[in-house]
Structure formats: structure tokens, C-alpha cells
């Protein structure tokens, strides 16, 4: 994957790209507190047949983190749409893969600009939470005062296999959350994304876009029952439950999730 930077009206956005020249595109949108690097090689593996792009959302990873920004789903969605326009992946041949917060944003982008989206993949997506779950509240507390032990502990609660939490991941999170304005961006994003919901009627606007819903059966961040809420609201959708996986099944069962995404998008 090649690292690039996009300039969106003065906002610097970092992204990773592979497979440029392929006719169809896949845009990967990460979750809260994560980055473009967290997709464990799936974008690279798919780049044999697709032009794949994973971005650092503003406020996260290495992208800019303006203190003046209100980190709402609406603002994230507008930025993603501007990003798609800038990279000329707005030709209706782009599929979007969103995890957690990224799933909420991906759904909103699809609703607002349906003509630009070919297929949609939602992985343990937020958007249906009426309030933060206990684990999300703990995640916020840890992010505001991170230590190696605290971060490792919260990450281990999000997976079924603690060996999937390498020290490098913990250290990377601590480094990035201590960057200027990163804690504000994290808190603002969490509050905004859990104080608003994707209404069922609004989700129905995705109708006609083939949608794959993937969920870890042991998700303690957003319970697996939420997969049914999305399926019931999006007519052309189906659900795949990943056994023995938590909130980020693509990190615990990468081969299985890769196959599901590849088969769905091919």
C-alpha cells in the first residue's frame, strides 16, 4: 500500500492506496480511535482486482485534527464525499467498507450519494445505539488518560483472542491519542455518534444497493443483535455472523472476512 496525502480545503487527509488502474474501487473507513492501518492486509489482498483506498478520518491516525471541527457524522460524511470527488472515485464504481463508526459514516454517505456507491459492507456498525454501551464509556475514559496497561485491557475486551492485540497496536494508539487535539476529536466523535441514530426509515433509502452486514458474535461494544436492526431496515442485505470474534472480526478472522468481502464484491 502506498501512502498519500489529500488536501481538502486545507484539511490534510492521509490515505493508503493500492491497485490503482483497476476499474472498480473499494473505500475502507475505519472505526473510532483507529486508522487506515488497521485493516490487516485486506485492502492489499483485494488490490489484485480492485483499486483499494483506506483513509485516516480527520481527527484520527495521521490526518489533521482541527480543534475547530465538530466531529459529527454529517461532517465526516461530507468530508468522505469530498475525498471521493477529489480522487475521482465518484463514478458509481465504488464499494464502501465501513467498520463501527466507519459503518455509520458509510451508510450515511450511501444515503446521501447513492449514485456514487455500487455496494456497501457494514462491519459491526454503529448507528443504532441509543446511548454509549458500558465498554464504549470505558474506552472514552481510557482514551482520555491512556497507559499501556489500560489500553491493552480495553482492547482485549473487544476481541476473543488477546493475542490479536500486539504491543505495537497499543503503542500506536497511545502515540496518536496524545497528538494535539486527538483527545478532543475522540470525545467529540463518540458523543456525536452515540447521541444520534440512523433512523429505520432513513436506512430504507439504501434500498437497491446490495449490502453485506458482517458481525462478530462476541461483540461487546455493539451487540450482535444490532445486525438484525440493519438487516430489517435495508431490503437488499444479508448478514454473516463471524463465530469466535469480537468487535473487529477482520482482525481475528481476516481470511474469513476477506473471502466474504471478495465474494460479495466480485
What positions do the PLM features span?
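Acidic catalytic loop of the alpha/beta-hydrolase fold
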Residues: 218-222
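Catalytic active-site module of serine/aspartate enzymes centered on a nucleophile-bearing elbow/loop
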Residues: 237-266
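Short beta-strand/loop motif that positions the catalytic acidic residue
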Residues: 213-215
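Conserved alpha/beta-hydrolase catalytic His-Asp/Glu region
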Residues: 13, 130-133, 146-208
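Active-site loop/oxyanion-hole signature of alpha/beta-hydrolase fold enzymes
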Residues: 16, 54-97, 101, 259
Amino acid at each position: 500500500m502506498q501512502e498519500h496525502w489529500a488536501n481538502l480545503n486545507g484539511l490534510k487527509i492521509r490515505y493508503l492506496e493500492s491497485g490503482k488502474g483497476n476499474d472498480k474501487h473499494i473505500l475502507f473507513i475505519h472505526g473510532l480511535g483507529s486508522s487506515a492501518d488497521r485493516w490487516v492486509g485486506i485492502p492489499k489482498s483485494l488490490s489484485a482486482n480492485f483499486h483499494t483506498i483506506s483513509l485516516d478520518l480527520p481527527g484520527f491516525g495521521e490526518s489533521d485534527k482541527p480543534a475547530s471541527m465538530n466531529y459529527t457524522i454529517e461532517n465526516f460524511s461530507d468530508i468522505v464525499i469530498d475525498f471521493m470527488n477529489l480522487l475521482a472515485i465518484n463514478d458509481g464504481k465504488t464499494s464502501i467498507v465501513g467498520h463501527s463508526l466507519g459503518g455509520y459514516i458509510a451508510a450515511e454517505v450511501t444515503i446521501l450519494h447513492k449514485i456514487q456507491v455500487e455496494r456497501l459492507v457494514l462491519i459491526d456498525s454503529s448507528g443504532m445505539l441509543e446511548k454509549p454501551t458500558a465498554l464504549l464509556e470505558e474506552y472514552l475514559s481510557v482514551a482520555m488518560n491512556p497507559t499501556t496497561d489500560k489500553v491493552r485491557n480495553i482492547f482485549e475486551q473487544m476481541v476473543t483472542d488477546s493475542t490479536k492485540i500486539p504491543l505495537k497496536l497499543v503503542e500506536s494508539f497511545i502515540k496518536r491519542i496524545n497528538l494535539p487535539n486527538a483527545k478532543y476529536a475522540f470525545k467529540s466523535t463518540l458523543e456525536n455518534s452515540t447521541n444520534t441514530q440512523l433512523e429505520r426509515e432513513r436506512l430504507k433509502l439504501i434500498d437497491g444497493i446490495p449490502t453485506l452486514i458482517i458481525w462478530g458474535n462476541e461483540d461487546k461494544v455493539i451487540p450482535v443483535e444490532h445486525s438484525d436492526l440493519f438487516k430489517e431496515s435495508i431490503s437488499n442485505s444479508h448478514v454473516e455472523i463471524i463465530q469466535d470474534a469480537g468487535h473487529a472480526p477482520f482482525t481475528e478472522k481476516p481470511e474469513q472476512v476477506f473471502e466474504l468481502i471478495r465474494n460479495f464484491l466480485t
